[in-house]
Design a protein with these regions (language model features):
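A short, basic-hydrophobic beta/loop patch
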Residues: 1-47, 98
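Amphipathic alpha-helical extensions and coiled-coil-like segments
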Residues: 48-169
Length: 169
């Protein structure tokens, strides 16, 4: 028997248009290969949200042993686009839902990843309520990292002063 792996919407549209013939590629594929081809076809749809897309890439990588480079080549996207999509999956589930629902953009999601994990849910909630832009989140993250670096430098100076005092004693 034959099974449509990719192009079911085109096939349905051709039936609605009463076409008697539809161009097709007939090939043998085991269940695993059929699933891979169907997933790749679905990832090329324009109506996927960024989280669905990221989950699709993750499936290609984990289930089919592809690299990001392999996956990007199969779906016609750049490796960096695949990598950026996958980064979103590191967000907490409730924040990922906000991105999936469109309350936050993918840019917001990636910007939030620069903050400590325990701060991300509250920052996401604030961003939704206050309409914080991606650029504002990026500036906040940069300021936080600058303060962390300053704190680290102060600790290093204190440690060196302490060691100098110990050597003098």
């Amino acid at each position: 028997y034959y099974q449509i792996i990719a192009g079911e919407r085109r096939w349905r549209a051709s039936r609605m248009a009463n076409l008697s013939e539809v161009p097709a590629v007939v090939m043998e594929a085991d269940d695993c290969k059929a699933m891979e081809l169907a997933l790749i076809e679905n990832l090329q749809r324009s109506d996927l949200n960024c989280v669905e897309e990221a989950l699709g890439y993750q499936t290609l990588i984990e289930h089919f042993g592809m690299t990001q480079e392999d996956a990007s080549g199969r779906v016609g996207k750049s490796r960096s686009a695949v990598a950026n999509a996958l980064r979103l999956l590191a967000l907490p589930e409730d924040v990922l839902k906000k991105v999936s629902d469109g309350q936050l953009s993918p840019g917001h999601g990636r910007s939030l990843l620069a903050f400590p994990a325990e701060q991300i849910p509250q920052l996401a909630e604030d961003a939704v309520k206050k309409g914080t832009t991606v650029r504002e989140l990026e500036r906040m993250a940069k300021a936080l990292n600058r303060k962390k670096n300053d704190d680290d430098n102060i600790k290093a100076v204190r440690r060196n002063v302490f060691l100098d005092e110990v050597e003098l004693a």
